[in-house]
Amino acid sequence: MASKIFVDANVLLDFSLKRDNYSVSKQLIKLIIDGELQAFITPSIVHITGYWLTKAYGADKAKQILLQLLTDIQVIDCNHAVAINALNSKMTDIEDALQYYTALHHKINFFITEDKDLQKLAIPNLPVYSSQDFLNLL
């Protein structure tokens, strides 16, 4: 069975906006499309990504890109208990805490982000890697 990964907004934006880390994020997205990885995001990742895509490309193109991504990436949600756990955690960034604890709740294997601060806060049950570091593991 393919590894389950949570993909943070910055990774999707690197790919969709062709930012500096585009080539690495493209490799990761290709593995997802090829079915070698199962990818997950939350509704807030859709929101964040949609916001920046709309600013860059307009609403119609943003929706088109998001719908294409959601062909291969599943949306998972946070519940009340997960939100409480996230808010009681040592993480000071509330958004990151909600994403991380949602992924933990859904038994995701790896959390992929370019956020260096979040990478330092991982617990053994859900390791956090940059896209490149994760690809190096494969």
Give the positions of each predicted feature.
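Short, well-structured N-terminal submotif of metal-dependent ribonuclease cores
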Residues: 1-40, 54-61, 135-138
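Short beta-strand scaffold positions
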Residues: 7, 40-41, 77, 113
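A generic structural signal for short hydrophobic patches within well-formed alpha-helices
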Residues: 12, 46, 83, 118-119, ...
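Active-site neighborhoods of divalent-metal-dependent phosphate/nucleic-acid chemistry enzymes
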Residues: 74-116
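Acidic, PIN/NYN-like endoribonuclease modules and their adjacent C-terminal/linker elements
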Residues: 2-4, 72, 104-138
